[in-house]
C-alpha cells in the first residue's frame, strides 16, 4: 500500500470512529434525559396531579420518555451556540450535559421527599 492509500484508510477509520463515539455520547445523553423525564413525570408530576386535580392513570412509559429525552436533547441543547462551546471538545460538552442532567435528577429526587 502506498502512502496516499494509507492516509485515506486512516482518515476513514478515524472519521467513522469519531462518528460512533459522537453517536454513543448522544445516546447516553438522551438516555439520561429520558430517565429524568420518566422519573420526573411519574414520581413528581403524577402525585401532584392526583392530589390536586384527582387525575388518575397519568403514566409515561420508558419509550415515550426516551423520545421526549431525545427531543429535549436535540431541540434544547442543540439550539445554544456560543464562542465558548465552539472551543470545547465533544467530551467536555457531554460531561457538562451529563452533569446538568444528573443535577436535575437529584433536584427531582429531593423534591419528591417534600411532597
UniProtKB/Swiss-Prot annotation:
GO cellular component labels: plasma membrane
Gene designation per UniProt? yosE
Q: What is its main location?
A: membrane
Keyword tags:
Cell membrane, Membrane, Transmembrane, Transmembrane helix
Q: What is the lineage of its organism?
A: Bacteria, Bacillati, Bacillota, Bacilli, Bacillales
Query: How is this protein named in the record?
Result: SPbeta prophage-derived uncharacterized membrane protein YosE
Membrane topology designation: Multi-pass membrane protein
Compartments (UniProt record): Cell membrane
- Span-the-membrane segments of this chain are 20-42, 58-78, 95-115
